Amino acid sequence: MSGNAVTYRLGRNCKLYEGTAGAEATTEVTHAADVATNGTRERINITDRQLAALGFNGYASGLADLTITIQARRVANDAAVGAIRTAFKSASPISLKVLNGATGEGVKGDFVISDYNESQPINGAVDISITAYPTITDDSFPPTWIDETSG
C-alpha cells in the first residue's frame, strides 16, 4: 500500500488565547481541557411555487451563529481563566482566539461570556464550563475566521 502520510490534528496541540477586548488575544489559556468552536447558519425559507410544485421547500443561508465552549480546570491564581471569569462577572467583552493547531485554523475576535459554571464534584477536580458569543467593541477588530495562511 502506498500513498501520502496522513497528518491528524490532535486536540492537545490546539490553542486558546485570551486578551483585552479590541486587540488580538495573546495570553494562552493553558488550563483549558476541552474547547469547541460551534457554528450554525440561519435557514431562510425561499420556497416559491416552482419548488413547491416539485414537493420541496427551498432555503438560503442566513447569518452565522458562533459560540465557543470551554471546559477548564479551576487552578488557583490562573490569570488567564481569571480574566475570563472577570469578563463574565463584569459583563465586559474579552478577546479570544481559538486555533486547531499552533498555527492552524480557527476564529478570533471579541466575545461576551454568557455562561460561567463551576462544577465541584466530591471526588474530582473543580471544573469550569464557559460559553462565549461574538460581539463587537471596536470596528477595527470584528470577529474573524482564521485560515491556515492568515494566522
PLM feature spans:
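Short, surface-exposed, polar/charged, turn-prone segments marking secondary-structure boundaries
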Residues: 58, 97-101, 123-127, 138-143
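Solvent-exposed edge beta-strands and adjacent loop segments
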Residues: 2-71, 110-131
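Short acidic, gly/pro-rich beta-turn/loop elements at beta-sheet edges
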Residues: 78-80, 106, 121-123, 140-143
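Secondary-structure boundary/capping motif
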Residues: 71, 93, 133-135
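Short, acidic/charged, Gly/Pro-enriched secondary-structure junctions
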Residues: 74, 79-114
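Extended hydrophobic/Leu-rich segments
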Residues: 17, 29, 99, 145-146
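Protruding loop/beta-arch "assembly-hinge" segments enriched in small, turn-prone residues
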Residues: 1-6, 126-151
